[in-house]
């Protein structure tokens, strides 16, 4: 019998974390799909990433990298985060490092037809800390796939947001109730790691 993932219980293993940064790109924060609420989470997101790097916790950017005129998502949202453009680059404030990993994606989920699961498996990660935009969309879909693949999901509630408070609240509630996500804040997470 083949089992895809290890059984993740604290009784058998201590947690091995990675932080997933979803779509903290120029086009999402200040560009084509500008989100004013996205600007508000930049300081806490940067604080979490800096702390994770210092503690040796992998930082993985899951970035939209669309193909202009091809990708299905562009029909709904218009051109944004086109691969190779400034809009598809991580915002400067997050200080992307050479030690960070980048997983380009063409759909909402960071797992859909990418090598994110392979990367996490090779890093021996069992728990993902979710950050970025948007709590009710790409963060939610990435969290769903993480859960389905057997990862524990933690959401840094002050390092993720959505276009509106209602969308954010819906996303947080859904992640907690449907995937059993632990909802925490950056300061608490940095003490836990």
Give names to the regions the model predicted.
Residues 70-74:
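Metal-dependent catalytic neighborhoods of phosphoester/phosphodiester hydrolases
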Residues 65-66, 160:
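Glycine-rich beta-alpha junction loops
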Residues 26, 67:
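Short active-site segment of divalent metal-dependent hydrolases/proteases
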Residues 15, 34-52, 56-65:
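A short alpha/beta connector and helix-capping loop motif
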Residues 27-31:
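Short acidic, Gly/Ser-rich segments with clustered Asp/Glu that frequently serve as metal-coordination loops
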Residues 20-22, 63, 157:
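Active-site flanking residues adjacent to catalytic metal/cofactor-binding acidic residues
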Residues 2-18, 46-55, 79-193:
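Active-site-adjacent betaalpha module
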Residues 32-39, 75-81:
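Short glycine-enriched, charge-decorated loop/helix-capping segments at active-site entrances
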């Amino acid at each position: 019998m083949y089992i895809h993932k290890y059984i993740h219980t604290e009784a058998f293993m201590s947690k091995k974390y990675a932080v997933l940064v979803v779509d903290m790109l120029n086009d999402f924060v200040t560009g084509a799909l500008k989100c004013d609420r996205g600007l508000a989470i930049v300081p806490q997101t940067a604080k979490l990433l800096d702390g994770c790097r210092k503690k040796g916790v992998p930082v993985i950017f899951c970035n939209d990298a669309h193909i202009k005129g091809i990708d299905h998502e562009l029909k709904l949202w218009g051109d944004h985060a086109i691969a190779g453009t400034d809009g598809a680059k991580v915002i400067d404030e997050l200080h992307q490092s050479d030690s960070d990993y980048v997983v380009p994606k063409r759909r909402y989920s960071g797992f859909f037809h990418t090598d994110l699961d392979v990367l996490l498996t090779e890093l021996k990660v069992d728990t993902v800390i979710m950050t970025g935009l948007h709590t009710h969309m790409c963060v939610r879909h990435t969290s769903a796939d993480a859960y389905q693949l057997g990862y524990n999901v933690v959401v840094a509630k002050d390092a993720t947001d959505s276009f509106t408070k209602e969308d954010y609240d819906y996303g947080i509630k859904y992640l907690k109730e449907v995937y059993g996500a632990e909802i925490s804040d950056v300061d608490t997470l940095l003490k836990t790691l």
